[in-house]
Amino acid sequence: PSSSKYHGCVEGGLCQHCLNVYRAAQAELENIKKLGKVDINISSISEDNLIIATLLHDLCKVNYYKKAIKVFKDDATNTWHHYYSYEVEDNFPIGHGEKSVIMLQNFIKLAWNEILAIRWHMSAHDSGIATSSTERIAMYDSMTKCPLVIILQNADLFATYMMEETTDPKKENLID
């Protein structure tokens, strides 16, 4: 799954999400090119950079969720129900973007723009941004120096909220 209760909370959801992010990033890059002169250097983004950053930005979610049976109470009928869902099993508790970068670097050499884009793809949703001005400054610096950061942030948000359906596991996966 791509999450335990939001977008892509289904088997194969992470794969579909990453493909959607890639498609959204491709479209965004094409639209930027159509605008003509813009204040960012998009020529620094190769097709390989786009593929690696978009398809692998959430690598940290592989084996991060495990299947679980959960319980909820239907207040209208005052009955308890079981349903299949997912829960987090984090064996390497480090930041979301950082974890994907670290995992990837065990297998491939990442370009500097891929590292920055994957690290900061969560944007303001990254917990470190809310608590650390140093982290916030680093993210904003990355955004101004590396257009792939903004493209991945936008594509991830677009895929999540505009391309993917949020299902309710309580309704979709009801056992009893």
Language-model-detected regions and their locations in the chain:
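A short alpha/beta connector and helix-capping loop motif
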Residues: D74, K171-L174
